[in-house]
């Protein structure tokens, strides 16, 4: 069983969030510490701690998340210019151990990011 995180509490509506999208499999909400004019987190409702914990059973869910990220970006007006970020592990910046995709846009980004 995955650790109970702030994201699982958002899914259960135990704490508030500015939700911008929801379906049976995932939820998207505005980041409380945005790093761009548009910064939304897209999370699966299934409590996967990180991408490396996914199994072949999660194939459809992972595809769903990518397609929904594209749709959420379009709904937020950044559909043709956005960045997706997944941090997998504490050493690379993951602070909440519930898989989440950062959808960022609304300003230019540089490469490399870190």
Curated annotation (Swiss-Prot):
Q: Which Gene3D superfamilies match?
A: HIT-like
A single GO cellular-component term on record: cytoplasm
Record Pfam families: HIT
| GO molecular function, a single term | hydrolase activity
Q: Which PROSITE patterns match?
A: HIT_1 (PS00892), HIT_2 (PS51084)
The UniProt record lists the HIT domain at 6-114
Lineage, top-rank taxon, reads: Bacteria
Q: Residue ranges for motif Histidine triad motif? A: 98-102
Protein name, per record = Uncharacterized HIT-like protein slr1234
Q: Could you tell me which species this protein originates from?
A: Synechocystis sp. (strain ATCC 27184 / PCC 6803 / Kazusa)
């Amino acid at each position: 069983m995955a650790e109970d995180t702030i994201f699982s509490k958002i899914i259960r509506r135990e704490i508030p969030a500015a939700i911008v999208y929801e379906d049976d499999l995932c939820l998207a909400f505005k980041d409380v510490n945005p790093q761009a004019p548009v910064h939304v987190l897209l999370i699966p409702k299934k409590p996967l701690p990180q991408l490396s914990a996914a199994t072949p059973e999660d194939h459809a869910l992972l595809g769903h998340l990518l397609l929904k990220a594209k749709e959420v970006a379009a709904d937020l007006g950044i559909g043709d210019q956005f960045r997706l970020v997944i941090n997998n592990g504490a050493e690379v910046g993951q602070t909440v151990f519930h898989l989440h995709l950062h959808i960022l846009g609304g300003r230019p980004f540089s490469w490399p990011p870190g």
